[in-house]
């Protein structure tokens, strides 16, 4: 088979161009540190690297999300702790105020501190995260959730809670809505609430309420109605008499499965109500306690009314403290989930980075050796081309 001079030139040129392309690719790998400079070099590897890039970008977003929600949850945990301390102080003041020997001046000082505690609680409920977002506004940004007007606290947030993605298929709840934290708080014991009729004219004070038989009570609304200083009737929700009994100061009275302990002498017609514990805002609890202590107490009936509200408030405050402790424990559980997700993300990131490195990163020693090989091959091809160019039949005939 004869090979023409033109073919020899074409083959030689193609060989040199191929070597030059290999040299260029190898030099680019050494400069960039990336051996997947073109997808055509390794289509499967390039596709895998692209998937890992996307996964790593998602992990970075999850990390940013975790940082934000973790910061907000830590602030919520601190706010709940401060709110609990505020209620603890209010309870101490209530116990001090539940003292018949207290002077009017001392009681006035207690009332002033209770008012300050209410303002303090409002400030806690309106805290933000330092980035312009309220902690307790639910999903509503840009609003101050709580406002005090004419002695009443209103809520401008909503009941929602944002769910924040912190890992693949894993989301955690953001801070709780203020309505859940500060408004929907069970009064009384959390299960049942006993309260004195504000129209009572006797001196009886309800000291404690507790559920003795939950099956018997079953959440029923009942009323203890005194027919005299030492006799009473139990009425159901329809006003029907279901039982009667006699009373001595300090007695515990069973009211349909709920035990009421009273002291003092009631008047005929005085009543005490038993009901399933309703929700009561912590602001209302503080306001009610302060108002009761500030109210005139010149008569036995007025003093009994004040003491009944203080007694009820002590139960309400204890229930509110338990509520905040539960909220704080739930917040801690979410923070633990954020921390656990961070550990999982870190492990995943290390694994994916190692895989990506094996797919993409250049082995510099191997690439340098390969470059030397390609350069040597190019020099040999160039030398061969030069020799071929010098060959011709006329040279042989000289």
Q: What is the role of each PLM region?
A:
Residues 144-302:
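Cysteine-poor, low-complexity segments in flexible/peripheral regions
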